[in-house]
């Protein structure tokens, strides 16, 4: 059987519909249209509702958390460090992709794409931008940690917030190399009286599909993870080799704390994205999911990748004292503001009641 990789691969990344029934794989259908045999009908309604519910929960929780992270970094001057500038970029990418989940969830539940061509292109582009900006940002954070730990003198000139901002701009520009073309190739197409959101692979699909997919796998996952691994291997060797990295124990403790935070964020990212990346790679080699169980696993692996986008704010709150303090301050300020509003409202009502009573006492009673 010839490889049918392109269709399931695009399905994984932005939630269109792919072929899960092996009997249909033998039909003569162009590769870029195989997504149109909706797998949503192939999955039980209960499973679809579960996946959509997970998408919505991730969307709501992730948006609240990531927006709070961005607010804290913008609001407090002390939070505008090089590491936090990268964290802001990560939160921005996560926020954008989380905004697409209601549309993807609707697509899964209905079994077709109801939102038109422009939104289809937008969702596809955001998914790819998120994939590349996230891995590139984590790589930049790891290199930044490596410089801070292994080259502390050089770090004084290299690790500035302005240079971190420039790196973030370069990351988005580099991600556009993939984001713009897939947005152009993406479209909402009508097939069998259903509208499907998909990416049309250029002909010949047998060649360009696997080549493009393997390139994405390498540049969005394998190569960044290798760079990150090398950076942390060198950092661990450095941390074990010296007891004091800087002249101050407090500064040394802060360096180790931030390094641990970045390491945990990277580890969680790799843990969340490895299953779907491996699944996609297996499909690229020509092995297709042909059972309800395989389709369900693929869907949940995809959802796990999105779950990562709402986990980062939780990690910051637990592992970084500065974020924890800012989050606590924000929550306390919000609570105090609500209490003051309630108190002002009560005083206003009491004042009105008092004036009313006083007025009624001064008005002469009728004889």
UniProtKB/Swiss-Prot annotation:
Membrane topology listed for this record: Multi-pass membrane protein
Alphabetical list of Gene3D superfamilies matching this protein: Rhodopsin 7-helix transmembrane proteins
Modifications the protein undergoes after translation, according to the UniProt entry: Phosphorylation at Ser-360 requires GRK3.
InterPro entries noted in UniProt: GPCR_Rhodpsn, GPCR_Rhodpsn_7TM, Opioid_rcpt, X_opioid_rcpt
Subcellular localization, as worded in the UniProt entry: Cell membrane; Cytoplasmic vesicle
GO cellular component: cytoplasmic vesicle; neuron projection; plasma membrane; synaptic membrane
Keywords: Behavior, Cell membrane, Cytoplasmic vesicle, Disulfide bond, G-protein coupled receptor, Glycoprotein, Lipoprotein, Membrane, Palmitate, Phosphoprotein, Receptor, Transducer, Transmembrane, Transmembrane helix
PROSITE patterns listed in its UniProt record: G_PROTEIN_RECEP_F1_1, G_PROTEIN_RECEP_F1_2
Pfam families attached to this UniProt entry: 7tm_1
Glycosylation sites recorded in the entry for this protein: 21, 26, 36
Known tissue expression: Highly expressed in several brain areas, the intestine, liver and spleen. Detected in sympathetic stellate ganglion neurons.
PANTHER family assigned: NEUROPEPTIDES RECEPTOR (PTHR24229), NOCICEPTIN RECEPTOR (PTHR24229:SF11)
Similarity field: Belongs to the G-protein coupled receptor 1 family.
Protein's name in the database: Nociceptin receptor
């Amino acid at each position: 059987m010839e490889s049918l990789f392109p269709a399931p691969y695009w399905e994984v990344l932005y939630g269109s519909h792919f072929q899960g029934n092996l009997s249909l794989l033998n039909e003569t259908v162009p590769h870029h249209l195989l997504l149109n045999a909706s797998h949503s009908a192939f999955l039980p309604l209960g499973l679809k509702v579960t996946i959509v519910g997970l998408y919505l929960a991730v969307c709501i929780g992730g948006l609240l958390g990531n927006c709070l992270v961005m607010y804290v970094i913008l609001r407090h001057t002390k939070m505008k460090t090089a590491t936090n500038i990268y964290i802001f970029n990560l939160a921005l990418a996560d926020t954008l992709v989380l905004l697409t989940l209601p549309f993807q969830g609707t697509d899964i539940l209905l079994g077709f794409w109801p939102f038109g061509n422009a939104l289809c292109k937008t969702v596809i582009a955001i998914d790819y931008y998120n994939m590349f900006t996230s891995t590139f940002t984590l790589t930049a954070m790891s290199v930044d940690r490596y410089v801070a730990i292994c080259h502390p003198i050089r770090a004084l000139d290299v690790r500035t917030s302005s240079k971190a901002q420039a790196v973030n701009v370069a990351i988005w520009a580099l991600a556009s190399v993939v984001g713009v073309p897939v947005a152009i190739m993406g479209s909402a197409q009508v097939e069998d009286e259903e509208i499907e959101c998909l990416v049309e692979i250029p002909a010949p699909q047998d060649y360009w599909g696997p080549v493009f997919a393997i390139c994405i796998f390498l540049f969005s996952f394998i190569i960044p993870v290798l760079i990150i691994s090398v950076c942390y291997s060198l950092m661990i060797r450095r941390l074990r080799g010296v007891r004091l990295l800087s002249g101050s124990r407090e500064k040394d403790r802060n360096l180790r704390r931030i390094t641990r935070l970045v390491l945990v964020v990277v580890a969680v990212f790799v843990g969340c994205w490895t299953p779907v990346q491996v699944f996609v790679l297996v499909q690229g080699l020509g092995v297709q999911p042909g059972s309800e169980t395989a389709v369900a696993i693929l869907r949940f692996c995809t959802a796990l990748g999105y779950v990562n986008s709402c986990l980062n704010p939780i990690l910051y709150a637990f592992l970084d004292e500065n974020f924890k303090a800012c989050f606590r301050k924000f929550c306390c300020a919000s609570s105090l503001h609500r209490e003051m509003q309630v108190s002002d409202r009560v005083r206003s009502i009491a004042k009105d009641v008092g004036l009313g009573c006083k007025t009624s006492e001064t008005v002469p009673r009728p004889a």
